[in-house]
Amino acid sequence: MKMKKILALLISGAMVLSLGACGDSAASGGGAAQEAAVEETAEAAEETTEAAEETTEAAEETTEAAEETAEAAEETAEATEETAEVAEETAEAAPAADNGGLNVCLASEPATLDPALNSSVDGATMLAHLFSGLAKWAQDENGNLEIVPDAAEELPEGVVGDDGKVTYTYKLRDGLKWSDGKDVTAQDYVFAWNRAASFDLAADYGYMFEVVDGYADIWDTEDGEEKDEEGNPIPVQKNPDAKLNVTAVDDKTIEVVLANPISYWNELLAFPTYFPVREDVVSNEAWATDPSTYVNNGPYTMTDWAHNSVITLTKNENFVDAAEVTMPVINFYLSDDANNMLTNFKNGDWLLIDDVPTNEMESLKQEYPDEFIVAGQIGTYYVCWNTNQALLPEGSDITDPAEVEKAQQEIRRAINLLYDRNYIVNDIGQAGQVPASSFVAMGMTDADGSQFYENAGDNEGFVGYYDVSNEALTDNFNEAMEILKKYYDFDEASQQFTNFPTLTYLYNTSEGHKMIGEYLQSALAAVGITMNLENQEWNTFLETRKNGDYSIARNGWLADYNDPICFLDMWTTASGNNDVQFGRGADATVKAYSLDLTDLGYDTKVEDGTWAETYDVLISDIKSCTDNETRYKLMHKAEDLLMSTGCICPLYFYTDPYMLDSSVKGFFANPLGYKYFMYTTIE
């Protein structure tokens, strides 16, 4: 989760993949409204049947048309049955909670509510209501977002030492309590940060502490005796006792040393991975799965978790700023069914929903002009390839591992040219998304204040790594075909490739993601490439993708803070978010990557090196660079290397569409996709 994954993953069905917007469906709503939905569905089914009969009569004119119509009628009937089933399930579901609280639905069951382990946007939103970090996101009197002190008395400037390291000293506020009444201490933060960064926990966002002195020692590894499935040695720590350079000077004073100055440190302090946890609480590995063992220090406590249904948060009277919390109860309903969400919103049962059916977008803009909201968001929706997926045809004469990878890089880049991104955003997304030609998202600034993405790719005539304009579709297609013909048999009569290996596209359950998958499938089928579609429930999907058990998968990333590095450091070999598997498995020893930094005053020049010898080194140089202009040039080189692999196929830059009932006042959201309800009222 980054302030990208929390700004991801990932947002959900309405084509905004916020990494935590999909998962198991949950029951909610109820009563006459759901019965009416069933009746409406039945009427729709009758109308569909009549339409099918009329179509059948028309189809008698030609056998071919009749067959096509029959297939369409079958699909319509199946869709009608599925809609009826959803409506029936909704009708039978438990009614919305009547506890005087605010009912909202962000996504399905979160994978975890442990701050160190969460990597989804919906989970981050809940954690922001449950924990208090040293800093937080807030609105000023003009409604502008800013980072302000939270558990810390103030956010002081760092002191730069002769060695270039930066020391920050924080004083905790008086009166800080855990939800069980015990005092919050500086040692709680020290423990939590070391736990999140630890080698043993291997948290997805552990690398968020890479800026802290000592992190490099924790992750300094050597080959161990055990081997993985590919026969490669499993890394072990050289220094098992290594810790972050953060200390509790006393119960209320925290001192932390950064390896070098960074501009986004305060934003990291507001990130959920930096939230405190207590050692005696988390010693129970299941602590974060049940309200009876869940101890936190934020505005709310968890009072109920009906798994796959609803999580109830109740105002924490031990919270130091409890007097400012205006909403006594928040009910987070759990669902990945956009139709179910919309039904409950229209019924008035849920006052905010973070996903809407794609096919309802245009009508909702007209019907709910003040409640259908499309907010800005710094993120990228993309397709990722598993770098270890074999793409060359059976019997290919290319066998050297490095040459195989170079060929597959070219193949992936070619396939990425076959997609019409304008069709995806205009006909499927319909929420103001912008076609993407680079990975670092629109909204990230460059060293001179311009947009980082506008300076990507170093191409004349267009921005980014390929031309996404409608005018370039034919040229892109022709270029892709010429490349693919180098590696595959092509039948001129059918204009299709005949020996491209079958692919499988993995996506998390959502109608929006499915529609995009179906479009990608059709674009490849047009040239003879078969790509099957496979959907999984959110938590299963995350695990499958993380483990590299896929060939191609849907993905998305939201900025974690306002610096392009949050889109780039996730792809280092050891990163918990390296779903592409760069530098892992078979790719660990493949020497197919090149890097030249001599034009920026560095000695680094690698021709045909491993991922660790090139990309990992480059990210390390970026993290230690103190010259701002050079640092940004290094980040452009990192994106160049990343995009040269073809493993990242950006489709569009995100927007954040959601529905908020006009009765809710005091709500705000940040650019990371987090939504804040603690200061709301219902009028």
Predicted regions, residues:
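N-terminal lobe/hinge region of extracytoplasmic solute-binding protein
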Residues: 105-163, 295
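A structural "hinge/loop" feature
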Residues: 106-128, 151, 204-205, 265-275, ...
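A bilobed periplasmic-binding-protein/Venus flytrap-type ligand-binding module shared by bacterial periplasmic
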Residues: 137, 314-319, 379-411, 418, ...
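Gly/Pro-rich hinge or "lid" segments in bacterial periplasmic/extracellular proteins
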Residues: 139-142, 222-233, 237-243, 247, ...
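Aromatic- and charge-enriched surface segment that lines or borders ligand/interaction sites
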Residues: 153-211, 255, 344, 401-407, ...
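Extracellular/periplasmic solute-recognition and catalytic clefts
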Residues: 303-314, 331-394, 422, 426-428, ...
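Append "and occasionally in soluble cytosolic enzymes with long acidic Gly/Pro-rich linkers
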Residues: 405-522, 526, 637
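Detector for C-terminal structural segments
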Residues: 416-455, 511-521, 544-683
